[in-house]
Protein backbone atom coordinates (compact mmCIF):
# COMPACT_ATOMS: atom_id res chain seq x y z
CA UNK A 1 0.00 0.00 0.00
CA UNK A 2 1.30 3.46 -0.93
CA UNK A 3 2.36 5.63 1.99
CA UNK A 4 0.55 8.91 2.60
CA UNK A 5 2.37 12.19 1.90
CA UNK A 6 2.53 12.92 5.64
CA UNK A 7 4.11 9.55 6.43
CA UNK A 8 6.67 9.99 3.64
CA UNK A 9 7.51 13.45 4.96
CA UNK A 10 7.87 12.20 8.54
CA UNK A 11 10.28 9.48 7.39
CA UNK A 12 12.33 12.10 5.55
CA UNK A 13 12.31 14.36 8.62
CA UNK A 14 13.54 11.59 10.90
CA UNK A 15 16.68 11.38 8.76
CA UNK A 16 17.12 14.98 7.63
CA UNK A 17 15.46 17.35 10.11
CA UNK A 18 17.36 20.41 11.31
CA UNK A 19 18.90 20.45 14.75
CA UNK A 20 17.62 23.64 16.35
CA UNK A 21 18.20 24.77 19.95
CA UNK A 22 14.47 24.81 20.75
CA UNK A 23 13.84 21.32 19.37
CA UNK A 24 13.98 17.98 21.10
CA UNK A 25 14.57 14.66 19.37
CA UNK A 26 11.61 13.06 17.62
CA UNK A 27 9.05 11.85 20.14
CA UNK A 28 10.65 13.47 23.20
CA UNK A 29 8.79 15.75 25.63
CA UNK A 30 9.02 19.44 24.75
CA UNK A 31 9.28 22.35 27.19
CA UNK A 32 6.41 24.73 26.30
CA UNK A 33 8.36 27.74 27.60
CA UNK A 34 11.15 27.02 25.14
CA UNK A 35 8.63 26.81 22.30
CA UNK A 36 6.91 30.00 23.43
CA UNK A 37 10.13 32.03 23.30
CA UNK A 38 11.18 30.58 19.94
CA UNK A 39 7.76 31.22 18.38
CA UNK A 40 7.77 34.88 19.41
CA UNK A 41 11.31 35.34 18.08
CA UNK A 42 10.51 33.59 14.80
CA UNK A 43 7.63 35.92 13.95
CA UNK A 44 8.78 37.67 10.75
CA UNK A 45 12.41 36.66 11.43
CA UNK A 46 14.55 33.88 9.94
CA UNK A 47 15.78 30.87 11.90
CA UNK A 48 19.40 31.79 11.20
CA UNK A 49 18.92 35.25 12.71
CA UNK A 50 17.03 33.95 15.73
CA UNK A 51 19.42 31.20 16.91
CA UNK A 52 22.09 33.38 18.63
CA UNK A 53 19.44 35.62 20.23
CA UNK A 54 17.50 32.59 21.45
CA UNK A 55 20.58 31.06 23.08
CA UNK A 56 21.47 34.29 24.91
CA UNK A 57 17.86 34.84 25.94
CA UNK A 58 17.44 31.35 27.39
CA UNK A 59 20.72 31.64 29.25
CA UNK A 60 19.54 34.89 30.86
CA UNK A 61 15.91 33.78 31.38
CA UNK A 62 15.95 29.96 31.70
CA UNK A 63 12.42 29.71 33.11
CA UNK A 64 9.14 31.45 32.47
CA UNK A 65 9.20 32.68 36.07
CA UNK A 66 12.54 34.42 35.53
CA UNK A 67 11.18 36.10 32.41
CA UNK A 68 7.96 37.18 34.10
CA UNK A 69 9.92 38.83 36.92
CA UNK A 70 12.41 40.58 34.61
CA UNK A 71 12.62 44.30 33.97
CA UNK A 72 11.42 45.13 30.46
CA UNK A 73 14.61 47.07 29.70
CA UNK A 74 16.69 43.97 30.43
CA UNK A 75 14.55 42.13 27.89
CA UNK A 76 14.92 44.93 25.33
CA UNK A 77 18.69 44.84 25.80
CA UNK A 78 18.81 41.16 24.82
CA UNK A 79 16.39 41.79 21.95
CA UNK A 80 18.47 44.56 20.36
CA UNK A 81 19.05 43.86 16.68
CA UNK A 82 16.28 41.29 16.37
CA UNK A 83 13.72 43.95 15.49
CA UNK A 84 9.94 44.12 15.95
CA UNK A 85 10.32 45.08 19.61
CA UNK A 86 6.59 44.81 20.24
CA UNK A 87 7.21 41.05 20.31
CA UNK A 88 9.54 41.41 23.30
CA UNK A 89 6.97 43.41 25.24
CA UNK A 90 4.19 40.99 24.31
CA UNK A 91 6.30 37.97 25.28
CA UNK A 92 6.98 39.55 28.66
CA UNK A 93 3.28 40.23 29.21
CA UNK A 94 2.33 36.71 28.13
CA UNK A 95 4.90 35.19 30.49
CA UNK A 96 3.45 37.21 33.37
CA UNK A 97 -0.07 36.06 32.50
CA UNK A 98 0.93 32.39 32.31
CA UNK A 99 2.76 32.56 35.64
CA UNK A 100 -0.20 34.34 37.23
CA UNK A 101 -2.77 31.82 35.98
CA UNK A 102 -0.50 28.88 36.74
CA UNK A 103 -0.70 26.99 33.45
CA UNK A 104 0.25 27.14 29.77
CA UNK A 105 -2.61 27.36 27.26
CA UNK A 106 -3.67 24.01 25.83
CA UNK A 107 -6.50 25.14 23.57
CA UNK A 108 -6.63 27.63 20.73
CA UNK A 109 -9.11 29.79 22.67
CA UNK A 110 -6.76 29.96 25.66
CA UNK A 111 -3.74 30.75 23.49
CA UNK A 112 -5.48 33.52 21.56
CA UNK A 113 -6.23 35.37 24.81
CA UNK A 114 -2.51 35.94 25.36
CA UNK A 115 -0.82 39.10 24.13
CA UNK A 116 1.10 38.79 20.87
CA UNK A 117 -0.36 35.41 19.91
CA UNK A 118 -2.39 35.22 16.70
CA UNK A 119 -3.85 32.16 15.02
CA UNK A 120 -0.59 31.04 13.37
CA UNK A 121 1.54 31.41 16.51
CA UNK A 122 -1.19 29.69 18.53
CA UNK A 123 -1.23 26.74 16.13
CA UNK A 124 2.56 26.38 16.18
CA UNK A 125 2.75 26.64 19.96
CA UNK A 126 0.04 24.04 20.57
CA UNK A 127 1.31 21.58 17.98
CA UNK A 128 4.97 21.81 18.97
CA UNK A 129 4.44 22.01 22.74
CA UNK A 130 1.67 19.47 23.27
CA UNK A 131 1.46 17.52 19.99
CA UNK A 132 -2.06 18.81 19.43
CA UNK A 133 -3.59 18.48 15.92
CA UNK A 134 -3.16 22.09 14.83
CA UNK A 135 -2.27 23.20 11.31
CA UNK A 136 1.01 25.09 11.33
CA UNK A 137 1.58 27.73 8.65
CA UNK A 138 4.66 29.91 8.14
CA UNK A 139 6.49 31.24 5.09
CA UNK A 140 8.09 27.88 4.39
CA UNK A 141 4.78 26.03 4.62
CA UNK A 142 3.06 28.53 2.33
CA UNK A 143 5.76 28.03 -0.29
CA UNK A 144 5.56 24.23 -0.07
CA UNK A 145 1.75 24.16 -0.31
CA UNK A 146 1.60 26.61 -3.21
CA UNK A 147 4.16 24.64 -5.20
CA UNK A 148 2.71 21.25 -4.29
CA UNK A 149 -0.71 22.26 -5.63
CA UNK A 150 0.58 24.75 -8.24
CA UNK A 151 -1.28 27.67 -6.67
CA UNK A 152 -0.18 30.72 -8.64
CA UNK A 153 -2.66 33.40 -7.57
CA UNK A 154 -1.47 36.13 -5.18
CA UNK A 155 -1.23 34.74 -1.64
CA UNK A 156 -3.68 37.31 -0.24
CA UNK A 157 -6.37 35.97 -2.60
CA UNK A 158 -5.95 32.29 -1.69
CA UNK A 159 -5.17 32.31 2.04
CA UNK A 160 -8.17 30.11 2.91
CA UNK A 161 -7.31 27.67 0.13
CA UNK A 162 -3.73 27.39 1.40
CA UNK A 163 -4.95 26.82 4.96
CA UNK A 164 -7.43 24.14 3.85
CA UNK A 165 -4.81 22.20 1.91
CA UNK A 166 -2.29 22.52 4.73
CA UNK A 167 -4.88 21.20 7.18
CA UNK A 168 -5.71 18.27 4.88
CA UNK A 169 -2.05 17.21 4.77
CA UNK A 170 -1.36 17.56 8.51
CA UNK A 171 -0.61 14.28 10.25
CA UNK A 172 -3.16 13.94 13.06
CA UNK A 173 -1.21 11.30 14.98
CA UNK A 174 2.06 13.23 15.13
CA UNK A 175 1.32 16.90 14.43
CA UNK A 176 4.41 18.15 16.29
CA UNK A 177 6.94 16.31 14.14
CA UNK A 178 4.85 16.92 11.03
CA UNK A 179 4.88 20.68 11.70
CA UNK A 180 8.66 20.66 12.06
CA UNK A 181 8.98 18.42 9.01
CA UNK A 182 7.03 20.59 6.58
CA UNK A 183 8.83 23.73 7.80
CA UNK A 184 12.17 21.97 7.25
CA UNK A 185 11.08 20.82 3.80
CA UNK A 186 10.59 24.46 2.84
CA UNK A 187 13.82 25.58 4.50
CA UNK A 188 16.08 22.84 3.14
CA UNK A 189 14.55 21.51 -0.10
CA UNK A 190 11.69 23.65 -1.41
CA UNK A 191 13.72 26.84 -1.07
CA UNK A 192 12.81 30.21 -2.62
CA UNK A 193 15.63 29.92 -5.16
CA UNK A 194 17.20 26.79 -6.64
CA UNK A 195 14.80 24.28 -5.04
CA UNK A 196 16.20 20.75 -4.94
CA UNK A 197 13.28 18.99 -6.59
CA UNK A 198 15.26 15.85 -7.47
CA UNK A 199 15.71 14.91 -3.82
CA UNK A 200 12.35 16.18 -2.55
CA UNK A 201 10.36 13.50 -0.69
CA UNK A 202 7.16 14.94 -2.17
CA UNK A 203 8.43 15.11 -5.73
CA UNK A 204 5.93 12.59 -7.09
CA UNK A 205 3.00 14.54 -5.63
CA UNK A 206 4.15 17.99 -6.75
CA UNK A 207 2.12 19.69 -9.49
CA UNK A 208 4.79 22.36 -10.04
CA UNK A 209 7.89 20.19 -10.34
CA UNK A 210 8.13 20.72 -14.11
CA UNK A 211 7.20 24.40 -14.02
CA UNK A 212 9.57 26.88 -15.65
CA UNK A 213 8.38 29.54 -13.18
CA UNK A 214 8.85 27.54 -9.99
CA UNK A 215 10.81 30.31 -8.25
CA UNK A 216 7.87 32.68 -8.79
CA UNK A 217 5.63 30.42 -6.70
CA UNK A 218 4.20 31.49 -4.32
CA UNK A 219 2.99 34.72 -5.86
CA UNK A 220 3.86 37.38 -3.31
CA UNK A 221 2.68 40.34 -5.38
CA UNK A 222 2.49 43.37 -3.11
CA UNK A 223 2.23 47.12 -3.43
CA UNK A 224 5.51 49.01 -3.29
CA UNK A 225 6.30 50.38 0.17
CA UNK A 226 5.60 54.03 0.87
CA UNK A 227 8.70 56.16 1.45
CA UNK A 228 8.95 58.70 4.27
CA UNK A 229 11.55 61.43 4.77
CA UNK A 230 12.86 62.77 8.05
CA UNK A 231 15.78 64.11 10.07
CA UNK A 232 17.74 62.71 13.00
CA UNK A 233 19.98 64.70 15.35
CA UNK A 234 23.19 63.69 17.13
CA UNK A 235 23.45 66.36 19.83
CA UNK A 236 26.60 66.73 21.97
CA UNK A 237 27.36 68.88 25.01
CA UNK A 238 30.71 70.43 25.94
CA UNK A 239 31.87 67.20 27.63
CA UNK A 240 31.19 65.20 24.48
CA UNK A 241 28.16 63.42 25.94
CA UNK A 242 25.36 62.62 23.49
CA UNK A 243 21.66 63.35 23.98
CA UNK A 244 19.18 60.46 23.98
CA UNK A 245 15.44 60.17 24.55
CA UNK A 246 13.10 57.29 25.28
CA UNK A 247 10.08 56.47 23.14
CA UNK A 248 6.61 55.99 24.58
CA UNK A 249 5.47 52.47 25.50
CA UNK A 250 3.08 52.29 22.55
CA UNK A 251 3.59 52.49 18.82
CA UNK A 252 6.60 52.10 16.54
CA UNK A 253 9.84 51.15 18.37
CA UNK A 254 8.01 51.60 21.67
CA UNK A 255 10.03 51.72 24.87
CA UNK A 256 13.41 52.01 23.13
CA UNK A 257 16.00 54.76 23.38
CA UNK A 258 16.88 56.90 20.40
CA UNK A 259 18.42 60.10 19.14
CA UNK A 260 15.87 62.87 18.54
CA UNK A 261 14.27 62.62 15.08
CA UNK A 262 11.22 63.74 13.18
CA UNK A 263 9.22 62.45 10.23
CA UNK A 264 9.66 65.69 8.29
CA UNK A 265 12.52 67.90 7.19
CA UNK A 266 11.51 70.95 9.23
CA UNK A 267 14.04 71.75 12.01
CA UNK A 268 12.71 70.77 15.45
CA UNK A 269 15.25 72.73 17.52
CA UNK A 270 15.89 76.46 17.92
CA UNK A 271 19.67 76.03 18.14
CA UNK A 272 21.94 75.67 15.13
CA UNK A 273 22.46 72.23 13.62
CA UNK A 274 24.88 71.07 10.94
CA UNK A 275 23.85 68.91 8.00
CA UNK A 276 26.40 66.07 7.75
CA UNK A 277 25.33 65.38 4.14
CA UNK A 278 24.86 61.79 5.28
CA UNK A 279 21.64 59.82 5.45
CA UNK A 280 20.45 56.31 6.19
CA UNK A 281 17.56 54.27 4.84
CA UNK A 282 15.70 51.77 6.98
CA UNK A 283 12.87 49.48 5.88
CA UNK A 284 9.95 48.79 8.19
CA UNK A 285 7.13 46.34 7.50
CA UNK A 286 4.89 48.85 5.73
CA UNK A 287 7.17 51.72 4.74
CA UNK A 288 10.71 52.83 4.02
CA UNK A 289 12.26 55.65 6.06
CA UNK A 290 15.01 57.96 4.79
CA UNK A 291 16.67 60.04 7.52
CA UNK A 292 19.09 62.92 6.96
CA UNK A 293 21.66 63.12 9.76
CA UNK A 294 22.36 66.40 11.56
CA UNK A 295 24.78 67.14 14.41
CA UNK A 296 24.87 69.89 17.02
CA UNK A 297 27.12 71.01 19.88
CA UNK A 298 25.27 72.91 22.59
CA UNK A 299 25.65 74.20 26.15
CA UNK A 300 22.08 73.80 27.39
CA UNK A 301 19.70 70.84 27.55
CA UNK A 302 17.42 70.60 24.46
CA UNK A 303 13.76 71.56 24.69
CA UNK A 304 12.62 67.93 24.93
CA UNK A 305 12.76 65.28 27.64
CA UNK A 306 15.91 63.19 27.62
CA UNK A 307 19.42 62.95 29.00
CA UNK A 308 23.06 63.30 28.03
CA UNK A 309 25.15 60.14 28.35
CA UNK A 310 28.81 59.39 27.54
CA UNK A 311 28.95 57.71 24.10
CA UNK A 312 30.65 54.64 25.56
CA UNK A 313 27.62 54.11 27.81
CA UNK A 314 25.15 53.87 24.93
CA UNK A 315 25.50 50.09 25.09
CA UNK A 316 23.65 50.13 28.43
CA UNK A 317 20.47 51.33 26.74
CA UNK A 318 18.27 49.37 24.31
CA UNK A 319 18.46 51.03 20.89
CA UNK A 320 16.75 49.96 17.68
CA UNK A 321 18.74 48.87 14.64
CA UNK A 322 17.59 52.09 12.99
CA UNK A 323 19.31 54.27 15.60
CA UNK A 324 22.43 52.13 15.61
CA UNK A 325 22.67 52.62 11.85
CA UNK A 326 22.47 56.40 12.37
CA UNK A 327 25.29 56.41 14.92
CA UNK A 328 27.50 54.06 12.90
CA UNK A 329 27.07 56.18 9.77
CA UNK A 330 28.87 59.04 11.53
CA UNK A 331 31.01 57.28 14.15
CA UNK A 332 31.80 53.96 12.40
CA UNK A 333 31.09 51.77 15.45
CA UNK A 334 28.30 51.51 18.01
CA UNK A 335 29.61 50.91 21.56
CA UNK A 336 29.29 47.41 22.99
CA UNK A 337 29.26 46.21 26.58
Regions found by a protein language model. Give the residues of each.
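Intrinsically disordered, low-complexity, charged terminal extensions of DNA damage-control enzymes
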Residues: 1-24, 28, 187-337
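Catalytic cores of DNA base-excision repair glycosylases
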Residues: 3-198, 202-207, 211
Amino acid sequence: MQQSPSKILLNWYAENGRRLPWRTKTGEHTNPYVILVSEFMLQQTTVKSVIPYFKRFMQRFPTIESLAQADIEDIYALWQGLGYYTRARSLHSTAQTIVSQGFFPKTRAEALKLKGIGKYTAASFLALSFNLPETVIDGNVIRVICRLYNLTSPIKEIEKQIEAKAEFLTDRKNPADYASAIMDLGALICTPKNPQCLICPWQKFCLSKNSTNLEKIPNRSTLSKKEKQGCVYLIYNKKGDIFITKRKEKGLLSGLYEFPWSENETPIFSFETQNTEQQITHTFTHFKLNLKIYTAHISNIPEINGQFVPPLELAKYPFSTLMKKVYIKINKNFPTQ
